Design a protein with these regions (language model features):
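Exposed, interaction-prone extracellular/peripheral surfaces
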Residues: 8-13, 22, 31-67, 74-280
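N-terminal low-complexity, intrinsically disordered segments
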Residues: 16-26
Length: 280
């Protein structure tokens, strides 16, 4: 609630709102009048750890995350909300929510620097934690401290290494805010590639995937399915809406459809009408 003005006391006014300074000057009781805050804080938590600099088709996950963040930010600006963000890539780049286009433009500058194919990836590797879960866990923990209760929070990640600590942070964050999870996936994580031998890397470790081997193919398919189900179950148990966006998707179309169908009550602050004003 924001202070608006003080006026003369009227019978029935809450005495807890007395403006004692004005009362002392005027010699007559005055009360403070408040106006409900209209600008809702919108926070974007963006995962740019090494594994996000990956795609077999379409755009890198990191680039897709930046596109989605831009769409949400401009939709928030169009709706009169305050835009802030937290980019985590081994280090945290934090932007407190700001009104108008300033907050969005500041966020975009950080995203351009952080998603550069060479500089962004190298910075992510240089500051990478021992596990990506550490980065997501600390980002969620930090967001709980800085986010004003009632904020609308979007988490953009592939959600690998999700664990019980992260699930606990999600629950605590959800208790006082509206939270939306956006999982960015590559087609390779939805179905195995054609039968062959492939070199694979997460940016830090290298390996071989032989889909000609029946055992490896089954294990790989099962691993992908289990990860998908684990993330979906974690979000469902905490009443957090979950959107899957592929690196080959049209981000604007997927986001607009999701907002119009799934977020009518939870995240109506950023409406589909506002999203339609944005084009990447």
């Amino acid at each position: 609630m924001d202070y608006q003005e003080s006026r003369a006391y009227q019978p029935g006014d809450d005495v807890r709102s007395m403006d004692w300074r004005v009362t002392a000057r005027a010699g007559y009781p005055y009360v403070k009048m408040y106006e409900e805050e209209r600008e809702r804080p919108v926070m974007l938590l963006i995962d740019l750890n090494p594994g996000m600099f990956f795609a077999t088709q379409g755009a890198f996950k990191s680039v897709m995350a930046a596109r989605i963040a831009a769409l949400i930010a401009w939709a928030g600006v169009a709706n009169g909300d305050r835009i802030g963000g937290l980019i985590f890539n081994g280090k945290h780049q934090e932007l407190q929510p700001r009104s108008g286009s300033k907050g969005a433009l500041h966020l975009f500058r950080l995203l351009v620097q952080s998603t550069d194919p060479e500089q962004g990836m190298q910075a992510s590797l240089d500051h990478a934690d021992s596990t990506d879960s550490t980065g997501l866990h600390s980002a969620l923990k930090r967001c709980r401290r800085v986010a004003k209760p009632g904020s609308l929070i979007f988490i953009l990640s592939d959600f690998y290494h999700i664990n019980e600590d992260i699930k606990g942070q999600l629950l605590r964050l959800r208790q006082h805010n509206d939270v939306v999870a956006i999982q960015i996936v590559d087609p390779l994580e939805q179905s195995p590639p054609p039968s062959d031998v492939y070199g694979v890397s997460d940016g830090e470790h290298n390996g071989i995937l032989d889909t000609r081997n029946r055992g490896q193919l089954v294990s790989y398919t099962q691993w992908c399915s289990e990860h998908h189900d684990s993330v979906a179950q974690a979000m469902r148990k905490r009443a957090i809406p979950l959107l899957h966006i592929s690196t080959t998707d049209d981000a604007a179309s997927a986001l607009r459809q999701f907002m119009s169908s799934s977020l009518t009550s939870t995240a109506g602050t950023v409406s589909s009408a506002a999203t339609e004003k944005v084009a990447l």
